[in-house]
Regions:
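Positively charged, small/polar-rich N-terminal and surface patches that mediate targeting and assembly
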Residues: 1-146
Length: 146
């Protein structure tokens, strides 16, 4: 039987609420595989950059960064990521808006277009979270796995 509490389902292995980050990639752009991977990495790291860079000291040490319980659990745990796909910019932006409405961290990536897209800045992907699965799933749970 699954162990649950009032805040949501718990992971059977750790007894903690499961956490993840979901990377949403636009497939209509037909990016090269390496480009897709790089864009997804940019999306994932955008969260960390936003949280840490403002707290860097002149010596380059992140001082006084405060992570939520979910963020700390994700960082201390598996750093689990799930990649899903959408078929258009409109679908990508709909996920972005849905995450904002749900109060879940979301980071939209716009590629500068230097190596693909003919020099045109192009929205390629986004990252939702990290957060608890039960907060992210209402935002991305209906999207197809990549």
């Amino acid at each position: 039987m699954d162990e649950k509490d009032e805040e949501g389902e718990k992971d059977e292995g750790t007894g903690q609420r499961p956490t993840k980050q979901v990377i949403v990639i636009r497939r209509d752009l037909r990016m090269r595989r390496g480009k897709e991977i790089a864009q997804g990495a940019h999306a994932s790291m955008a969260w960390l950059r936003q949280r840490v860079v403002p707290h860097l000291t002149p010596a380059g040490v992140a001082d006084q960064v405060k992570f939520s319980e979910a963020e700390r659990a994700w960082l201390d745990g598996s750093l689990r990521k799930v990649t899903v796909k959408v078929g258009s910019e409109a679908e990508l932006l709909a996920v972005y808006d849905k995450a904002l409405e749900a109060g879940v961290a979301v980071h939209l990536i716009t590629d500068r277009g230097l190596t693909e897209f003919g020099g045109t800045p192009t929205r390629t992907c986004l990252a939702v979270g990290p957060d608890y699965d039960d907060r992210i799933d209402p935002v991305t749970g209906d999207l197809e796995l990549y």
